[in-house]
Structure formats: structure tokens, C-alpha cells
Amino acid sequence: MNRMFRVEDFAGILDPRLIPGSEDADFLWDWLSKTLYDHCDVEGIFYLAYPVGESGGKPEVLIERAIWRTSYPEDYLNAMPGNPLTNDYSANHVLETGEVSRWHDPESLPKMTKGERARIELDEKYNMSIGACFPIFTSSRRICGGFGLRSKSQDALTFDRVIQQHHAEIGRLLSTFDEKFRGPYARTQFKLAPQEARVLAYLAGGMAVQRLAHEMGLSPKTVEAYMSSARKKTSSSTSAEAVAKAIFFNLV
């Protein structure tokens, strides 16, 4: 029998103050997964965060410049023709509008492209048709990513009732989680060496390379080498982009 959402399940568990104060990205992820699974019957999370200004272009470009993590089923991910954002109407709607979007909203169907309709068929095949996407924002209220919450065993009407009544609480929990998770997780992805992070920190403060080299007791050539390595590790085409990512992902 499907376990139904209960409104009372959301009363206390969505308090952002309950999020652990930890720098361990895996521990934080497991906490969110267990909390939503135990109390809300959410099974499967997708997380995406990217620096503001990087949102233009195709989803393939965006996801390459972002950090993301998911607990969606492996067979579902392998069946996708592209990455998780490819032809995902709900996810792209959230990233464009900043509005909560239900995966199974019937009003969305007429607006979908052929590829997006094919994605819906794939979702149904892998029992991924019920869920919702939530946006995350910068302090200036610009969209910088979001979460997908997949409910495997939920009745759509019950799930919609919970989203309608508690989307604000869920949104606050996810937003606060992002603030605590983004830095620790980004560090596991970019793996900057201490000197590379230090160089980016000086650049973020507006310091020129020559002065930076003097400050660190290094040659300009060595500093340039650190900058090049930092660009590569952060998948940045320029040093300015690497600095922007370092600031956004709390690496400096």
C-alpha cells in the first residue's frame, strides 16, 4: 500500500535550524535524504547550483558549469538521451521563472516540445512522473539553481495538496540546506589546492598578479601556473570566471 503524505508530518521537520552544522557534504546529503524519506516519502533528490550569469544557453552548457548531485535511480539516468536537464520541462521552467513546478502538472503538457513529451514518457517508464522542482536564489533573489524532489509511491492528488499547503516551508528548508551544503560539496568537486584557493582569494580582492606574487613570495610565473590549474579544476575559461565560481561556491 502506498504511504500517503500527511500534513502533520511537515510541522516540525522542516525547521531549517535542524540542519546539522557540518562541513561533511555526504553527511549533510544523507541527512536531507533521510529526513525527506522518513517524514515526507520523498525518494530521490536532484540538486543543482551555478553562479549567476552562467544560466544562458543550452542545458548541456549550464550543467557543465554547475555543481550537481542526485540520488535518482541509476537506470533512469543511464536511459536519458542527454544530461538530467535535457528536455526536462519542469526543471527548465523553474530555472527560467523561479517558480515551484510540479512534474505532473497537466497544464504543462500543451506547452511542451516533442523532446519534452518524450522525456515525460521516459519519466513514466521509470516511475519518475510524480514530483516537484524548487528554485534556490542568491541573496539578491536571482535564480542560481534548484532541487528536484521525486516521490516514488505518492498519490498525485495527495502530493499536490502537500505542495500547495507547504511549498513555502519546503522552499525555506531547501534554501537553507543549499547555503550549508554548497561550499562543502563544491570543495569535493573542485579539489583546489591551498595555494590555488589563496591565489583566487587575492584575485577576488582585486589584487594584480605582480602584487599577488610579491605578497605570496612567489614568481609571477608560478602564480600564473596556479591560476591555470584553478581554471582547469573549476572548468572556467577565464580567471574572472574561476574567481566568480570561487566566491559563489564559498571556496575563498
Locations of regions flagged by a protein language model:
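Regulatory sensory and allosteric helical modules in signal-transduction proteins
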Residues: 65-115, 121-124
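Signal-transducing coiled-coil linker helices
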Residues: 17-31
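Juxtadomain coupling helices with adjacent low-complexity linkers
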Residues: 1-16, 25, 144-193, 201
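Short, basic, alpha-helical segments at the C-terminal edge of helix-turn-helix-like DNA-binding modules
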Residues: 239-249
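Short hydrophobic beta-strand micro-motif common in sensory/regulatory domains
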Residues: 130-137
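Short alpha-helical "packing" element that flanks the helix-turn-helix/winged-helix DNA-binding module
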Residues: 196-203, 242
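Recognition helix of helix-turn-helix DNA-binding domains
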Residues: 208-241
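Short, hydrophobic-rich beta-strand element in sensory/regulatory alpha-beta domains
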Residues: 32-37, 42-60
